[in-house]
Every structure is written in C-alpha cells, then in structure tokens.
C-alpha cells in the first residue's frame, strides 16, 4: 500500500512538473520584473507572495491540463512517452481533478487582490486551458503560450498599482516575443515527432528560417525592453543586464546552429539565465 501511494504521489509530482522547475522560472522572472517596475522598487510583500505561489500553482496547472490534452499523442513522442498518463500511472479524470484543485487554490489567492486583478485572472485561466489544444488548430500555438506566460505581467501591474499603464503592455509584448523565441527552441527538439503526428508548432512553421526568426524575436525583445527602461527611467544596471542577456542570446544562436536536439534543449534552458539577469538589473536599479 505504501509503495502504491508513493508511486501515485510521484506521478502527481511528474504531472505538475515539480521535478522540472524550468517552466516555473521562465514564468516567474517576468512576473517579478513587472512587480518591481509597477512598485518602483520592492513590491507589497503579500502581493509578492501571492504572485510567487500563484506562478508555481498555475504553471503546474498548465502542465497538468497540457498532459490531459496530449494524452493520445505523448506516447508516440520520445521526450514525453514516459509521462504518467501514457504510462497508465494515472487516469484522465484524476488529471482533471488535479487541475481543478490547483486552479481553485490559485483563484483563492487572487481573491485577496483588487477587483481589476481578479477580473484579469479569468483571462489567465482561459489562456492556460486553451493553449494545449492550439497545437491541433493554429500554425503557431507558441503565440497563445506567449500570451499565457505573459498575462501575469498586466496582473502584476493591476495588483501593485491598480492600473494598466502603457509600459505594462510593452513588458507584456517583450515577454510574448521572448516566449515564442525560446519555445521555438523547445519545439525544435520535437519537430520530427510533431510532423509525424500532424501537430503544429512554430518550429515547423518557420522551417529552415527558424534560427533567423528566433534571432529577430530576441532582438525585438531587447529593443522593447530598452524602451521600457527609458519610459521607466531605469539606471545603468538595467542596461548592463540587457547587454548580458544579448550575449546569452548570441550563445543560444551558436547552440542551435546545427539544430541538434540536445543543443536546442540546452538553448531553451539557458533562457532561465536571461530572465534572472534582467530581474537582477531591475532590482539593483532600485537599491
């Protein structure tokens, strides 16, 4: 009985990707950028706690509903064949129940925020639910993922400043483009499998132009973040962080130049450092 309970618990951990925090970190860094920018420094501590915990919960919820949506495909993809659903370790109804629990806890936290933030949270839930199914219908599902991974930015401004200034939407746009860039690197890992299954991705859509388009998206991200710095009157630490991020983008281009699966995955993982460096630049600016 203990062994069965342990295996079930491990399956839930895998469903929620608690053992793979990269997605949580990629969602967390821009959320923290937005909180600090909206507050002109250290944000309200309760708001900070709600968003950090909320990021963890909603990223996990997104992974859970993604596995439910892909339950008939994951067993045919090398990278995902060992997930709990295709392995038969959990039932589809259990996956939906776990998603509901995670989403409800997240919503309970949001209810402690102001009405504007609560209203925006419904769009966040809709995006989280819709994204996994977009791989069947639109040629660039990463656009929806980018919106989902960026929606915490206007929510952060709403919670901290009770307003949605233009700069909030610039940060949103920068993060949207960055997300498409790094998730295209991720999609390059699965491109051959996705083609066989008839699934869609930006890596398939961009084809042989993938590296150039990723580079263009990365450049646009940096240019928009430069504008954010000007509008927010940020100091030199922020611009040094953007320069460091640019160097990492160049490094990622070197990694993906041969389109090898492992190298593309390493380029994707490297984006964690991009987000962390920009956050460090923002925080140091306000010290």
UniProtKB/Swiss-Prot annotation:
Protein localization: Cell inner membrane
Entry EC number(s):
2.5.1.39
* Membrane topology annotation: Multi-pass membrane protein
The residues that cross the membrane are 21-39, 95-115, 116-136, 138-158, 161-181, 213-233, 234-251, 264-284
**Gene Ontology biological process:** ubiquinone biosynthetic process
The record's listing under InterPro entries reads: HB_polyprenyltransferase-like (IPR006370), Prenyltransferase (IPR039653), UbiA_prenyltransferase (IPR000537), UbiA_prenylTrfase_CS (IPR030470), UbiA_sf (IPR044878)
Species this protein is from: Aeromonas hydrophila subsp. hydrophila (strain ATCC 7966 / DSM 30187 / BCRC 13018 / CCUG 14551 / JCM 1027 / KCTC 2358 / NCIMB 9240 / NCTC 8049)
Reaction(s) catalysed (UniProt annotation)? all-trans-octaprenyl diphosphate + 4-hydroxybenzoate = 4-hydroxy-3-(all-trans-octaprenyl)benzoate + diphosphate
Pathway entry: Cofactor biosynthesis; ubiquinone biosynthesis
Source organism superkingdom: Bacteria
Q: Which UniProt keywords apply?
A: Cell inner membrane, Cell membrane, Magnesium, Membrane, Transferase, Transmembrane, Transmembrane helix, Ubiquinone biosynthesis
Record's Gene Ontology CC terms? plasma membrane
The entry's function note states:
Catalyzes the prenylation of para-hydroxybenzoate (PHB) with an all-trans polyprenyl group. Mediates the second step in the final reaction sequence of ubiquinone-8 (UQ-8) biosynthesis, which is the condensation of the polyisoprenoid side chain with PHB, generating the first membrane-bound Q intermediate 3-octaprenyl-4-hydroxybenzoate.
Q: Has the keyword Membrane been applied to this entry?
A: yes
Q: Which cofactor does it need?
A: Mg(2+)
- Pfam families in the record: UbiA
The molecule here is called: 4-hydroxybenzoate octaprenyltransferase
């Amino acid at each position: 009985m203990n062994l069965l309970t342990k295996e079930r618990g491990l399956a839930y951990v895998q469903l929620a990707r608690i053992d793979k925090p990269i997605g949580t970190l990629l969602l967390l860094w821009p959320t923290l950028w937005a909180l600090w920018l909206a507050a002109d420094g250290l944000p309200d501590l309760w708001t900070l706690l709600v968003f950090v915990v909320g990021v963890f919960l909603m990223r996990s919820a997104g992974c859970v509903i993604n596995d439910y949506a892909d339950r008939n495909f994951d067993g045919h993809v090398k990278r995902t064949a060992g997930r709990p659903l295709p392995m038969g370790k959990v039932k589809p109804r259990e996956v939906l129940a776990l998603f509901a629990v995670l989403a409800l806890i997240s919503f309970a936290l949001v209810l402690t925020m102001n009405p504007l933030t609560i209203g925006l949270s419904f769009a966040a839930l809709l995006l989280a639910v819709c994204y996994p199914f977009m791989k069947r219908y639109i040629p660039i599902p990463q656009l929806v993922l980018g919106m989902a991974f960026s929606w915490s930015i206007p929510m952060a401004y709403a919670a901290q400043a009770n307003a949605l200034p233009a700069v909030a939407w610039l940060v949103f746009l920068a993060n949207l483009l960055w997300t498409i860039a790094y998730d295209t690197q991720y999609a390059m890992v699965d491109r051959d499998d996705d083609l066989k299954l008839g699934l869609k991705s930006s890596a398939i859509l961009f084809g042989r132009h993938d590296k150039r388009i990723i580079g263009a998206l990365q450049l646009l991200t940096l240019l928009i973040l430069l504008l954010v710095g000007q509008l927010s009157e940020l100091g030199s630490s922020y611009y040094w962080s953007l320069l460091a991020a640019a160097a990492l983008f160049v490094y990622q281009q070197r990694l993906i130049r041969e389109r090898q699966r492992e190298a593309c995955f390493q380029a994707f993982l490297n984006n964690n450092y991009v987000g962390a460096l920009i956050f460090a630049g923002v925080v140091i600016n306000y010290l």
